[in-house]
Amino acid sequence: MPEQLVLRATLEGHSGWVTSLSTAPENPDILLSGSRDKSIILWNLVRDDVNYGVAQRRLTGHSHFVSDCALSFDSHYALSASWDKTIRLWDLEKGECTHQFVGHTSDVLSVSISPDNRQVVSGSRDKTIKIWNIIGNCKYTITDGGHSDWVSCVRFSPNPDNLTFVSAGWDKAVKVWDLETFSLRTSHYGHTGYVSAVTISPDGSLCASGGRDGTLMLWDLNESTHLYSLEAKANINALVFSPNRYWLCAATGSSIRIFDLETQEKVDELTVDFVGVGKKSSEPECISLTWSPDGQTLFSGWTDNLIRVWQVTK
């Protein structure tokens, strides 16, 4: 592998696990992070020698852990999901919450925004998936064909021509949904443990899922078939496709594994030297991942409250 990922910087600002990270295609100089400290931070990526990123705004209002966050594609707004059962929409110019999405009866575990910035999907421990408009009106609650356990992850296809989203749950299922009719297209079974992460490739053709069983499963969204599986051999906390390489990155415990989808092999494993972690205490884990829009920088969120920034180098 001629290209490698090298640890470039760490971002300090949260006082709890960094549960989620998001970037926006139209603004490469910002990063959004959500945390168990109940806050969301908007980072300005200055990339100088002193600071790689500066905390520009801290968004507060949730009364429990922030479990997921998403930037709108135009980067004007942000969404956050929380264990306080709500989703919030934030105006990033003003730094204030403009709408609360109320309707879930248990912790909201995941949130995603459509490529046209107009629709929002959420998944919850109440076992439902809800589709909302951007100002917080619930348009539809999916129960028919839905999950029989916690809905851990929901993600829109980033391809605006592909009106689908996917969901994953603790019922070991991965489900593909039609956004126009809110109907179930396919249920994918194969995982032997709960599924905690699901993601769609940039062109909308592939879906990857992972979780407790340590297996990455690749699904063809056009043909509704299982393509192949990759063994991570560790609990998978988060997944993300590279925007410009045939790479799939998996947060697996205290490391990040990079798989090449052409060779179907692991090509890199990113690890951190944790100083002062005793033999009895476990190492911090990576639990969130996102790429910069140009695919040159991988951001990772950890349970030691840090964001670690990795750069692709030749």
Swiss-Prot record:
Cellular-component GO terms for this entry: cytoplasm; cytosol; nucleus; plasma membrane; ribonucleoprotein complex; ribosome
InterPro entries linked: G-protein_beta_WD-40_rep, RACK1-like, WD40/YVTN_repeat-like_dom_sf, WD40_repeat_CS, WD40_repeat_dom_sf, WD40_rpt
SMART domains: WD40 (SM00320)
Domain of life: Eukaryota
Record's keyword terms, sorted: Cytoplasm, Membrane, Phosphoprotein, Repeat, Ribonucleoprotein, Ribosomal protein, WD repeat
Signal peptide: none
GO molecular function: protein kinase C binding; protein-membrane adaptor activity; ribosomal small subunit binding; ribosome binding; signaling receptor activator activity; structural constituent of ribosome; translation activator activity
Modified residues (Phosphotyrosine): 52
One BP annotation, GO: rescue of stalled ribosome
Phosphothreonine: residues carrying this PTM: 10
WD repeats: 13-44, 61-91, 103-133, 146-178, 190-220, 231-260, 281-311
Gene3D superfamilies: YVTN repeat-like/Quinoprotein amine dehydrogenase
Phosphoserine modifications at: 39, 148, 242, 255
Main localization (coarse): cytoplasm
Described function: Component of the ribosome, a large ribonucleoprotein complex responsible for the synthesis of proteins in the cell. The small ribosomal subunit (SSU) binds messenger RNAs (mRNAs) and translates the encoded message by selecting cognate aminoacyl-transfer RNA (tRNA) molecules. The large subunit (LSU) contains the ribosomal catalytic site termed the peptidyl transferase center (PTC), which catalyzes the formation of peptide bonds, thereby polymerizing the amino acids delivered by tRNAs into a polypeptide chain.
Complex and partners: Component of the small ribosomal subunit (SSU). Mature yeast ribosomes consist of a small (40S) and a large (60S) subunit. The 40S small subunit contains 1 molecule of ribosomal RNA (18S rRNA) and at least 33 different proteins. The large 60S subunit contains 3 rRNA molecules (25S, 5.8S and 5S rRNA) and at least 46 different proteins. RACK1 is located at the head of the SSU in the vicinity of the mRNA exit channel. RACK1 interacts with the mRNA-binding protein SCP16. RACK1 also exists simultaneously as a homodimer in a cytosolic non-ribosome-bound form. Interacts with pck2.
UniProt record similarity statement: Belongs to the WD repeat G protein beta family. Ribosomal protein RACK1 subfamily.
Protein name: Small ribosomal subunit protein RACK1
